[in-house]
Amino acid sequence: AGLGAPYWAPEARGTVTGLTRGSGKGEIARATLDAMALQNVDILMAMEADIGKPMTALKVDGGASANNLLMQLQSDYLNRPITRPEVIETTVAGACFLAGLGEGVWASADEIARVWRSDRVFEVQLTDAERAERMLSWQLAVDRTLYTPS
């Protein structure tokens, strides 16, 4: 398993906490989405600490961005709006745009930037208290994975 950025702990073990006898596939799937979103919070916080200022706008792309619940969780936990583009496979689109720029299809990078379109903006729905509770639960879960008895 291991735990990547910003912890860099290859010895960490995977865990799912908070399960009850009534937990099923739905709860496991939701825990996975929560963990994905919360790991991104840790990474973004580390990035903001490195650059010394908050990032106010966040745009997402890639296959995972098609999941509305994941994007809403991301917005809620990061406490900022998340913007998803109409074309989520931006790596491929970017390669095509750069090739077009090189061949003269596009006059400038500014012209390419004007092609970008937003599909949806996910606005924060969690209260500060709810967010603080979930962040504390996440940090406790991370701490459990990092603990290695002697």
Predicted regions and their residues:
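Glycine/Thr-rich phosphate-binding loops that ligate phosphate moieties of nucleotide
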Residues: 1-150
